[in-house]
Amino acid sequence: MAAGIRNITTTGQIGDGREAAAVDYVLAHAGAGNIDDVLATIDKFAYEKSMLINVGDEKGTLLDAAVRRADPALALELGTYLGYGALRIARAAPEARVYSVELAEANASNARRIWAHAGVDDRVVCVVGTIGDGGRTLDALTEHGFATGTLDFVFLDHDKKAYLPDLQSILDRGWLHPGSIVVADNVRVPGAPKYRAYMRRQQGMSWNTIEHKTHLEYQTLVPDLVLESEYLG
């Protein structure tokens, strides 16, 4: 698994074919157009076949609740993987436009297949790139309608070292507004210490943050943290 984690940072996949197998499993077993069934089938694969690194069912309920609090018209996810997080966002905010940024074309292709099967590909879009690519992806998002004060919700679930610089890039564009919510997964494991320290320093000034104690995806032994932060402006 250690080799798989190293693969994640370069290819976006664990490296043993489980992501493609998960997509095939979903298309074979989940009802078309049924978001609940697609999500449950991904969870079933992760529990019974091969562990996946999407946010998962336990932490997914925290994500769902935060999305509902934000009630977004426009949502952004960083780190698509299989499209699971974006699918949960789309389910919790059925009127929202959801954009997901992913570094790996293979993951983008897998996610698009899952979104099409779930019936949400008309409002969930994958943009291949990274926020730290010199502005290309940020400019692409601008072409999709991202503008000053339009971004209601952000889900960070990509390279943990990129959480803080990528959030700063979003802030520099002015897309957030007072009341926008940012959720960050895996803040304890693998860990995003600089991001967590930033949110602690900014508590009550630029951000109001709740730290949710939970577990790493698809097991109950390893503790994790999900941070939910409301932007104060």
Swiss-Prot record:
CDD domains: AdoMet_MTases
Binding site for S-adenosyl-L-methionine: 55, 77, 79-80, 102, 159
GO molecular function annotations of the record: metal ion binding; O-methyltransferase activity
Keywords associated with the record: Metal-binding, Methyltransferase, S-adenosyl-L-methionine, Transferase
Sequence positions that bind a divalent metal cation: 157, 185-186
Enzyme class name: transferase
The organism's place on the tree of life at top rank: Bacteria
GO biological process, one term: methylation
Protein name according to UniProt: Probable O-methyltransferase Rv1703c
Species this chain originates from: Mycobacterium tuberculosis (strain ATCC 25618 / H37Rv)
Lineage start: Bacteria, Bacillati, Actinomycetota, Actinomycetes, Mycobacteriales
